[in-house]
Every structure is written in C-alpha cells, then in structure tokens.
UniProtKB/Swiss-Prot annotation:
<dbReference type="InterPro" id="IPR037269">
    <property type="entry name" value="PSII_PsbM_sf"/>
</dbReference>
<keyword id="KW-0472">Membrane</keyword>
<keyword id="KW-0604">Photosystem II</keyword>
<comment type="subunit">
    <text>PSII is composed of 1 copy each of membrane proteins PsbA, PsbB, PsbC, PsbD, PsbE, PsbF, PsbH, PsbI, PsbJ, PsbK, PsbL, PsbM, PsbT, PsbX, PsbY, PsbZ, Psb30/Ycf12, peripheral proteins PsbO, CyanoQ (PsbQ), PsbU, PsbV and a large number of cofactors. It forms dimeric complexes.</text>
</comment>
<dbReference type="Pfam" id="PF05151">
    <property type="entry name" value="PsbM"/>
</dbReference>
<feature type="transmembrane region" description="Helical">
    <location>
        <begin position="7"/>
        <end position="27"/>
    </location>
</feature>
<comment type="function">
    <text>One of the components of the core complex of photosystem II (PSII). PSII is a light-driven water:plastoquinone oxidoreductase that uses light energy to abstract electrons from H(2)O, generating O(2) and a proton gradient subsequently used for ATP formation. It consists of a core antenna complex that captures photons, and an electron transfer chain that converts photonic excitation into a charge separation. This subunit is found at the monomer-monomer interface.</text>
</comment>
<keyword id="KW-1133">Transmembrane helix</keyword>
<keyword id="KW-0602">Photosynthesis</keyword>
<dbReference type="GO" id="GO:0019684">
    <property type="term" value="P:photosynthesis, light reaction"/>
</dbReference>
<dbReference type="GO" id="GO:0031676">
    <property type="term" value="C:plasma membrane-derived thylakoid membrane"/>
</dbReference>
<dbReference type="GO" id="GO:0009523">
    <property type="term" value="C:photosystem II"/>
</dbReference>
<keyword id="KW-0674">Reaction center</keyword>
<dbReference type="InterPro" id="IPR007826">
    <property type="entry name" value="PSII_PsbM"/>
</dbReference>
<keyword id="KW-0812">Transmembrane</keyword>
<comment type="similarity">
    <text>Belongs to the PsbM family.</text>
</comment>
<keyword id="KW-0793">Thylakoid</keyword>
Length: 34
C-alpha cells in the first residue's frame, strides 16, 4: 500500500477538522456553564 501525500493530508484533515470542531464546542459549553 503506497503512501500518497495527498491521501495522507486528506485523511489528516478528515480526522482533525471534526476533532477540532468538537473541542471548540466543548470549550464553549464549559465556559458558558462556568
């Protein structure tokens, strides 16, 4: 299985973007309650 740079970046973005979005939501809800 060859590692493609574009595929690697796409996979990285596909994983990181929702994770960052959830972290931002989590921080916002915590700051509102606190």
């Amino acid at each position: 299985m060859e590692t493609n740079d574009l595929g690697f970046v796409a996979t990285l973005l596909f994983v990181l973007v929702p994770a960052i979005f959830l972290i931002i939501l989590y921080i916002q809800t915590n700051s509102r309650e606190g």
